[in-house]
Amino acid sequence: MDFNINRLVLLDALTKVSRAVSLKSPLPILTGIKFDLLEDGLVLTASDSDISIQTTINEGIIINQTGSVVLSSKYILEIIRKIDGDTVHIQVVDGTLTRITSESSLFDLNGSKSFDFPRIDLNKNGKHFSMKSYDFKKIIEKTLFATSEQETRPVLTGVNFKVDQHQLVCIATDSYRLAQVSMPIEDDIQFNIVIPKKSLNQIIHIIEKDEMIDLYVSDRKVLFVIGQYLVLTRLIDGTYPNTSRLVEDQGSYTMSINSSALLGAISRASLLSDEQSNIVKLTMSPDENVLSSYSQEIGSVEENLTKAFYKGEPMTISFSAKYLADAIRSIGTETIQLSFTEKMRPFQITGLDVNDNIQVVLPVRTY
């Protein structure tokens, strides 16, 4: 294997592909990146068994001799990042010993034989649909934060993707809050899958420009085609809970308020709240709306929500300040609407007269 390549082109590809590498993998070979130098380009592959990423570089490269090797992800990435010059020369000089040279640097890096690297099926099989990459990225950013951090219910550690009747619905919940974003799609297909949070996190870092991405959904995996990148991820087994009642029950009491004003009030009210629970209380009536918090050790604070408009019977409700702030940022509109049913029932947060992004927060019992 012998080639010259633009350093920044290689660095960008290695940075993205290395997102699939786990340095704690029980298989030492999977702590590396596989280099396959073919006649028409360089193929880079990495995997941790749960997610695999592959890309092909065919620009900014001069191929001198084809071949393959597996190089440590940690070291090859740091070498290419810190080495000088615009062009890098990489050559396997003895067995798997790989020499990386630039204008003033020479590194000899021990590699591994490429046939020890597991074979990864990146064939484009399964149900197919396409969408704009920025739409996909937006959906993930508006739902991913609501996934569970607890492994006791693995299905809640991912995002539920449902497609039916030309509609994509993405749902995430940790049982204390819920995020649901929907959008129309052109493809006439049906599926209901759960994609791991980790995989989605890696995918949104690969998306850099607005282009069409293709998804191929199978029973146990889904393949993303993003430009020159192929991302294969396993799916989470299990049935995602039915959350339709939470988003259908809009509530008869509503409050509309400027998003920035409420975020500011939440930030100030949570200054004196308990650091662990971060609970605040919202007291509402048609005449006055107050956000407050209390800590026996620290003190108390009250915020008068002068820009809020409330319709309904007087009500007091307590909840996590962080959860509501996350929901408001996800909605992203200038004005939001909060919809309530009862004091201890989940309440909704939406944009005003918009229902393509529905956030739900569960109240808590407090002082």
Model segments located where?
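Structural preference for solvent-exposed beta-strand-turn elements
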Residues: 1-367
